[in-house]
Design a protein with these regions (language model features):
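Short, contiguous acidic/charged loop-to-helix segments that flank catalytic cores in large enzymes
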Residues: 89-91, 96, 137-149, 209-216, ...
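Flavin-dependent oxidoreductase catalytic cores
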Residues: 1-102, 106, 110-117, 121-122, ...
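Glycine- and other small-residue-rich loops at beta-strand/loop junctions that grip anionic moieties
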Residues: 6-10, 31-34, 165-168, 229, ...
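Residues within well-ordered alpha-helices
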Residues: 16, 41, 111, 154, ...
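Rossmann-like dinucleotide/flavin-binding elements
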Residues: 21, 96-127, 166-180, 188-197, ...
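N-terminal Rossmann-like dinucleotide/flavin-binding domain of flavoprotein oxidoreductases
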Residues: 133-179, 273-282
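Local beta-strand N-terminus motif with an aromatic residue
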Residues: 26, 181-182
């Protein structure tokens, strides 16, 4: 039967896709999400500019399930221009400015790359010792390792565009004034909240999801109550259970000497998370 066969589903690497066709395993490969992350993927592939392709992180953040069902516009965590291509055209500057970006997380890195590629003189200050910010914690969670590719790609683009980095550099009013930039972008991220407003919370040892994901704290035994039932909370619960029994499939509940309970105000866990990610996590 002479029926063309196409394959689809999480094939993010164009070289792998080409290999499937060249070996005669399929007649073609359909790529959806990778073209949201980088609409110029086919053009870059034809020009052998594989390092310039922005990789899809397979996060399923807003490309599968729209955030607002009343305005079902597809979005992309990696490419914020999706749906706004004509709102923010790429225009190289004819008046380069000295730009200081405080913070080397995903937001700071993307801003740095965008400004530098437009021709500005960009410097990034990061109080830590590496780029990535909270993305370094996100990729620790099971199934999120592909997000590392985006961070590696941002670093590649930043270096190619001439972005300068200073690590272990904390911004103050004084040293920012001394640096004398034309523009300052604050991209310092967020800090986890300790709910001191909850009566009696001070009677128990309280940690944050960051403490668990960063391995700053491990919980080999005991009873754990996680306040919140969003994606990060569920991933944290899974990691605690996985640590309790490393060689087993971890689910929330009780394993050995560890018992985890999630407390959520919404009627269900992981409200607003795309259905495939939610089903896998739960």
């Amino acid at each position: 039967m002479n029926i063309p066969v196409f394959v689809v589903g999480k094939i993010n690497d164009v070289r792998y896709a080409a290999d499937l066709v060249e070996r005669g395993l399929v007649d073609g490969v359909s790529m959806g999400r990778p073209l949201l992350a980088d609409p110029d993927l086919p053009k870059k592939a034809l020009e052998n500019r594989f390092d310039d392709i922005t990789p899809c992180g397979s996060c399923g953040g807003r490309c599968i399930t729209p955030e607002d069902p009343h305005h079902p516009v597809c979005k992309c965590h990696i490419n914020p221009l999706v749906g706004h291509e004509y709102d923010f055209p790429f225009n190289p500057t004819d008046k380069p400015r000295k730009v200081l970006i405080i913070g080397a997380g995903p937001g700071g890195m993307y801003t740095a790359v965008t400004a530098a590629e437009r021709g500005h003189d960009v410097t990034v200050w990061e109080k830590g010792k590496q780029i990535g910010g909270q993305l370094n914690l996100a990729v620790v969670s099971p199934g999120k390792q592909e997000m590392c590719k985006w961070l590696t790609h941002l670093n590649y683009r930043a270096k190619k565009a001439g972005v300068k980095f200073e690590f272990k550099k904390e911004a103050t009013v004084e040293n920012v004034k001394e640096f004398a930039p034309d523009a300052v972008v604050v991209a310092t991220g967020a800090t986890p909240l300790i709910p001191t407003f909850i009566k009696g919370v001070g009677d128990y040892p309280v940690i944050t999801t960051h403490d668990v994901l960063s391995r700053k704290v491990t919980i080999p035994k005991g009873t754990v109550c996680i306040l919140g039932g969003g994606e990060v909370a569920c991933e944290t619960a899974e990691m605690i259970m996985a640590d309790a029994r490393p060689n087993s499939f971890a689910t929330t509940g009780s394993i050995g000497d560890v018992e985890v309970t999630l407390v959520e105000m919404q009627p269900q866990l992981m409200t607003g998370v795309c259905l495939p990610n939610r089903n896998i996590a739960l």
